[in-house]
């Protein structure tokens, strides 16, 4: 049995609850958009996690249980590396797979960077008030 020390029940419940939301959102998008949905959720998730980290969490605007629930639970369940990998393997040509990989990795990095910059800038604006 895995023993976890210093984990609060509220945090576990938060990760569970927000994980259900993130997983459900990903599932609904995948029904509508197939493999395009995987790229979309991973790109959106990259932005959201960076924004959460650099604005909400770093500024400690939310209690720890809520920021963990949103980041690890919702964004973690919303994004998916395993589906990303299976989608790449299912593409018919090397060119398609390469394009998918590049859009996902480069786009994810750029959106995470954008989320970070936006979070930092909004944090500085909020500090002036």
Curated annotation (Swiss-Prot):
Q: Name one GO biological process term.
A: cellular detoxification of fluoride
Location of this chain's protein in the cell: Cell membrane
Keyword Cytoplasm in record: no
Principal subcellular localisation of the protein: membrane
Give the signal sequence positions: none
- Where, by residue number, does the polypeptide cross the bilayer? 9-29, 37-57, 74-94, 100-120
The UniProt record gives the binding positions of Na(+) as: 76, 79
Any single Gene Ontology cellular-component annotation: plasma membrane
Q: What does this protein do?
A: Fluoride-specific ion channel. Important for reducing fluoride concentration in the cell, thus reducing its toxicity.
Family that this chain belongs to: Belongs to the fluoride channel Fluc/FEX (TC 1.A.43) family.
What's the protein called, per UniProt?
Fluoride-specific ion channel FluC 2
> Which organism does this sequence originate in?
Ligilactobacillus salivarius (strain UCC118) (Lactobacillus salivarius)
Q: What is the lineage of its organism?
A: Bacteria, Bacillati, Bacillota, Bacilli, Lactobacillales
